[in-house]
Amino acid sequence: MIVDNSKDFDLKSFLANLTTHSGVYRMLDKHGEIIYVGKAKNLKNRVNSYFSKGAKDSKTLMMVEQIARIEITITPSDYEAYLLENNLIKQHRPKYNILFKDDKSYPYLVISRDKFPRVSFYRGKSAYKKGQCFGPYVSISSVKNTLNTIQKIFPIRQCENSYYKSRVRPCLQYQIKRCLAPCVGLVSQQQYDEQLAILKKFLAGKFSSVLEEISAKMYQASEDMEYEKAQVYRDQLVVLRKLQQQQIVDIQEDKTFDVIGIYMQDSYASIALLQIQNGDVVADRHWSIDAKGQDKTSIMHAFLSHFYLGDEIRNIWPKNIILSKVEFADITDLMNSISQKIGQAINWIIAPAADNLKWLKLAEVNARQKLNIYTSSKSQYQKRLESLKEFLELEKDIKRIECFDISHFQGEATIASCVVYTDDGEDRKSHRRYNIKGIKSGDDYAAIHQAVSRRVSSGLEADNLPDVMIIDGGKGQIHQAEAVFREYGIQDKVQLVSLGKGVERISGKEKIYKGFDDTEYTLDEHNPGFLLLRQVRDSAHDHAIKGQRKKVSANRQSSIIEEIEGVGSKRRKALLRYFGGWQELSRASVDEIAKVKGISKKLAQEIWECFH
């Protein structure tokens, strides 16, 4: 329950009447924004400690000065407090908490919830919404290799539902024995579910159990004189036994362990996580953070909560976790909560020796190298931001930059891209594209006007307009953006700037225009601010090109058949329904195409020639 909901907050009275139960506290500033989230076994003691006399670091003192209100949530146990704290930090990202930004989003294998489920891969933490998840995997290539291996062993469908539902005959995967063809009823629900159950055990790391089960099924099928079925099981066993020496998932969980190394320098820290299976590093992940006012123990505490109590899906948990040296007593409760969540005891190794010490040193070397790269890159980026701020004559620091670029193919399939950079660097998750509609072919000015108008409208509603908006183009393009700014009255809220290549069209010689200023500016090609403008512009251009190519490709696939005289919408639908997609149609012979109702041999020949 949230204890305080009053508008007039009396801090003295609040502190005096605080409960001694465990729970989570939230510090809010005068704007009502959460600036810090913490948990405590004893809320009264912990919250009061912020306002008592005693040595405090500068970061804590600065935070306390901004506290206008405190809210608490009482939890049934310390474990629930850890979980709630972790979720609130991820949800609100308070500026005084230690925030971890993972270096990438990891892919998972997902088994869908369909009647005849498909197995596929999905990148991101929302994978669990798609079905039962296994992972995360180290990279896209590793998860694709796993999918390929699965297809060789388990004939479970991997096709999209749209393709699956349109089938009227088995596809090539059935012919090469990599699918049971549930799409056309060639397998019973029971048989499919049996294969699916074995696959799930395989992905969960129960390798020995899978071998035993398939072996038993093979012998049973042989005794029942179902020799074709026995041969299928035998083929599965052959492939599985070849994999025993290089299996995808670990089959001996007691040999799995995580190693967490921390390296600190100045006001920054880097965490390296090595995941070890059977003596091999199967994954390494890194986080770099602003650690001003923090020590190694507090960083480790925050990281363990973030990583092990978070919502990332995992199927195999380590029996051992090796840590950089920290104050053990300060994280004991957290360790117990982690063990409670995963339902197994963990051997925490804080003073490693022998081989364990070698693993820890390797993790710490990785952390140091990553931090060196991070601080060097961050320092360079900050110099560029400061230089751009100076050139644009801005009073406040630049927190968010957005850049627009237009791309089209011969005037069609027009796309506007918008890329986002913050004071931390490129924010890929915030990039987006706009499909431009209702304009004349190749009208870049109208495209810019439409894209900027849509962005400003949504930005005013969400209160997230950028500090600087860059337009790729010259005077004509920036004038379109200026018109939008006047329409919405934001001339003084966002600094507008454009970057045009001019007559020479040479990179490094671009002309710069500021919003509502007709002066043409140039900067030295090595100027840090100019380098940032070009960096952001190039990113927007790449983002636009990729989106435009996807759109053109999709349009081409759907129109290739339309160009053939005699193939209307009905015949096009019949072809797609019969073959399930353009790819299968492109592989079909003339005779196969002619089998489609309404398609003559002559027309089939024309369709075949379209693809060859």
UniProtKB/Swiss-Prot annotation:
Organism: Francisella tularensis subsp. mediasiatica (strain FSC147)
GO cellular component entries: cytoplasm; excinuclease repair complex
SMART domains per the UniProt record, alphabetical: GIYc
Gene symbol of the encoding locus: uvrC
GO BP terms in the entry: nucleotide-excision repair; SOS response
Record-annotated GIY-YIG domain positions: 20-98
Classification via CDD domains: GIY-YIG_UvrC_Cho
Domain of life: Bacteria
Presence of the UniProt keyword DNA repair in the record: yes
Function: The UvrABC repair system catalyzes the recognition and processing of DNA lesions. UvrC both incises the 5' and 3' sides of the lesion. The N-terminal half is responsible for the 3' incision and the C-terminal half is responsible for the 5' incision.
UniProt keyword annotation of Phosphoprotein present: no
InterPro entries cross-referenced by the UniProt entry: GIY-YIG_endonuc, GIY-YIG_endonuc_sf, GIY-YIG_UvrC_Cho, RuvA_2-like, UVR_dom, UVR_dom_sf, UvrABC_protein_C, UvrC
Alphabetical UniProt keywords: Cytoplasm, DNA damage, DNA excision, DNA repair, Excision nuclease, SOS response
Subunit structure, interactors included: Interacts with UvrB in an incision complex.
Family: Belongs to the UvrC family.
Protein name, entry field: UvrABC system protein C
Compartment list: Cytoplasm
UVR domain location: 208-243
Gene3D superfamilies listed in its UniProt record: 5' to 3' exonuclease, C-terminal subdomain, GIY-YIG endonuclease, UVR domain, UvrC, RNAse H endonuclease domain
Matches recorded under Pfam families: GIY-YIG (PF01541), HHH_5 (PF14520), UVR (PF02151), UvrC_RNaseH (PF22920), UvrC_RNaseH_dom (PF08459)
GO molecular function, one term: DNA binding
